[in-house]
Amino acid sequence: MSSVFNAQSFLRTVSSSAGVYRMYDVKGDVIYVGKAKDLKKRLSSYFRKNLDNVKTQALVSHIHHIDVTLTHSETDALLLENDYIKQYMPKYNVLLRDDKSYPYILLSQHEHPRLAYHRGPQREKGHYFGPYPNGGAVRESLHLMQKLFPIRQCDDLYYKSRSRPCLQYQLSRCSAPCVGKVSNADYDEQVKLASLFLKGKDQQVISTLVAKMEQAAQQQEYEQAARFRDQIMALRKVAEQQEVSNNKGDMDVIGVHYASGIACFHLLFIREGKIFGSRSYYPSVPAQTDMDEVLRSFILQFYLNADIQRTIPKEVVISHNFEELHELEAAVSIALNKKFSIKTNVRADRASFLRLAVTNATNAVITRLSHKNTVEQRFVLLEEILELSTPIHRMECFDISHTMGESSVASCVVFNREGPHKGEYRRYNIEGITPGDDYAAMKQAITRRFDKIEAGGKIPDILFIDGGLGQLRIAQKIVDEKFVHLDKAPQLIGVAKGEGRKPGLETLILGDTETSFSLEGDSPALHLIQHIRDESHRFAITGHRNRRQKTRNTSTLESIPGIGPKRRKALLQHLGGLQEVKGASVAELVKVPGISIEMAQTIHDALRG
């Protein structure tokens, strides 16, 4: 305890009413915020002799002074405590750092509406579906929507500039309303069905399509009927894969695991009886904090964070009971002005969802504890930053290396959750492009890598491109083409060099949205990205140098198409050497056995070009 703080003198002035207290250190910073039904009793407990809690001992040793605010009830104290915690972010409180806005799917208000990823203020007119738990869930949903409903996902500027259908039309992902390939009525019908699907009413969508298919068949419009049939089959396949509850309401299911100072709250967002998405939260927990405080702090901060747009259901199911559960229910209900209930003892579907959430929370904590500061942990952090809904198992990175366009080589290196997987590394000798054209080189390498990709093949979860937006766009276009028949496609990320090419200043660009962002220079996730990028660069340079040296040590003749070892030997023997071959005319070259007039012309042009 600070020598300037007189606890006994302070406690004599404290009321036994309900209220909130704020503890300050010598610098005037709030280091802890708490609430109490009886302030005098609660604050006296901090200054007992023989404190056995390490956290409390550390806290008390830094107290310089304490401010107290009285409230009408314990419920009011809970709400005020939460406000102060958000305001001051005290070091000894449990803190949920969840200040990111949540992503939505936007169905725009337009003559031909588009589906788009949206995060931030909802300024654009249209319908917003969500919020989704993370960006990965939105990207997966948009990828699925492209397969189910041929609605455009391009921005309005791109839409206005079209004079002919783009690649998405060729891939049957868009009906090309920009150039009149679909009637307004048919397009509007698909928009309505997509809207119903996003609201969770997939059975209604299927019923509508079945009726349309039967009507088209009766009118002998068999191609149209076949399109409806394929759409119905795709929708039914999706519906079968979704885990559905008999309870059609909305609820959040929270599984909690807390061990060795690491707490994980794994949330399943159940909407219309389906798992809408899931997300793990890791609040900052001071050492020796008890479970009840961790639970109470999370519930308050998660559901009363007014800065984040979030759909809050009336029902929350959580894996642990705690002392102030009913007070929390009342406080959140008052703050939200709606009914809010927290349940712990549940059966049937709720119990099944709860077991799943607890399993995920437990596994998350075990993983964090056992792989801290390892490659595995860096993968976990990268998944969180990229907001992926599934773990990363395989990452690949491409780079191009050449000297003034000579001997271009592309590298592809592979990382798994143990680090570099060198047995999977590949190099591609780049041929037939304008020397120094990195875009064409990247296009050739990516095309060769995924030319015959199949569902059971080695598909990376993340594909890094060492370069800027131009190279990333080329790679994204190829991936879109090659993966159109598959349910899975890699997430592309461009790694653009920072100012002065200094490590730690890289800009990362998402291939599907072209959103750019940066990570802190000391971020373990950035270190993982730098590792795979540097390894790709090293592997490309090594391959380029080997190829360049081999080329320079090889006869010029062997670089001419159609000239192999036999013809090379014949030319040198017949004409007397390389310089004589270079000086020979077409007529002289034709006299060499095995050399046609066309080949002679090719040799002549190549050696004198």
UniProtKB/Swiss-Prot annotation:
Residues 16-94 form the GIY-YIG domain. Residues 203-238 form the UVR domain. The keyword Transcription regulation does not apply. PROSITE patterns: GIY_YIG, UVR, UVRC. It holds the Pfam family UvrC_RNaseH. GO terms for molecular function: DNA binding; excinuclease ABC activity. One of its GO terms (cellular component) is excinuclease repair complex. Keywords: Cytoplasm, DNA damage, DNA excision, DNA repair, Excision nuclease, SOS response. The keyword DNA damage applies. NCBIfam families: PRK00558.1-5, uvrC. HAMAP family: UvrC (MF_00203). The UvrABC repair system catalyzes the recognition and processing of DNA lesions. UvrC both incises the 5' and 3' sides of the lesion. The N-terminal half is responsible for the 3' incision and the C-terminal half is responsible for the 5' incision. Belongs to the UvrC family. Interacts with UvrB in an incision complex. This is UvrABC system protein C.
